[in-house]
Amino acid sequence: RAIGSREMLDIREAEYGGEMLYINRSEHHPMWATEYCRDEGLRKYWDEYSYPFHKEGDGPLYKGQPATDYNRNQDELAITMIARWYDYWRERPGTGNRVSSGGTKIIFSDTHYRGAENYRRSGVTDAMRIEKDAFYAHQVMWDGWVDTEKDQTYIIGHWNYPDNTVKPVQVVSTGEEVELFLNGNSLGKGKRQYNFLFTFDNVAFKPGKLEAVSYNKAGKEISRYAVNTAGEPASLKLTAIQNPEGFHADGADMTLIQVEVVDKDGQRCPLDNRTIQFTLKGQAEW
C-alpha cells in the first residue's frame, strides 16, 4: 500500500506492500509478490494462428473501453509476464541474501467485469492448478531464486497448425543464445529481448519436431526443449491431482481429476476443444 507505507518498516507483522520498496526488509518479513502483472488470458486462446483463432485482446468492453489486457492469448500473456519480470530482475535490489523465493498470481474479484470469463482466466495457473505457458516461462526465469541456478529452456505454445501457416516462435531461456531446429534443420538463432525471450520470425509450419537449443557465452549447449505435432485424437487420459498424503475418504476431501485428449502415442492434443461428458459412480458427490 502507498499511504503510510514507509511506517510499515518498523512493524513486526507481515503486511501488504510494494516489493521494490520492501525487499531490503524481506529477510525478516515474509513477502508475496502478487500484483506485478494483472494481465489475464483464457486457456483455450493459444494464439491467432490456431483454433479458436482468437484475435489478441479481443473481448467485451469495460466501461466502454477496450479491455485488451484482460483478454490476452496464451502466447502474449507469457511474453507480457516475461517483460514484467525482467523489469524487476534487472534491478533486483536488496541485501544480497536469499530473501525472495516465490510469487503468487492471485485471482481478482473484478475479473468477470473485464474479461470474457472469470476464474478460468486469471493467473499463471488456473483455479484447478493447471499450468499455463506463463507458468513455465516463470519456471525458467525464476526457479527458486532471482539469479539463474538451473539452466532451462521452454518453447511457448504448441506445434499444431493448419497447412501454410507462417508465424513467430517465442522461446524463453536462461542461455545467451538460442537456436531453433525444425525436423533437425536449423532455422538460425533468435532475436533476444528482456534477457530471457528469444523470437524467431516467420517460421513456416511443417508437422514434426520443433526444438530449441540454448547456449552459454562460450557457445556450449546448456539446455534444450522440444515440442511435437500431435496426431489425431485417440483417447482420454485421466490424471488424479492429490497432495503427497493421497486421498482421504473422510467425506471432506476433494478429488481433482485432470482430463486430457491424447493421440495414439499418449501425446496431448492441444486444439481438441470438444465437450466431454462425465458419469460418477460410488460413494462420492459431483
List each language-model region with its residue ranges.
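Short beta-strand segments within Ig-like beta-sandwich modules, predominantly Fibronectin type-III
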Residues: 187-194
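Beta-strand-rich binding/interaction modules
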Residues: 167-186, 209-214, 273-279
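Beta-strand-rich structural segments
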Residues: 171-172, 214, 252-269
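Short aromatic-acidic-glycine turn motif
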Residues: 191, 235-238, 278-286
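Surface-exposed, short loops/turns at beta-strand junctions within beta-sandwich domains
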Residues: 202-207
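Short, solvent-exposed loop/linker segments at the N-terminal edge
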Residues: 159-165, 244-255
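Substrate-binding/catalytic cleft of secreted carbohydrate-active enzymes
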Residues: 1-141, 145-162, 193, 199
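Edge beta-strands of extracellular beta-sandwich domains
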Residues: 218-231
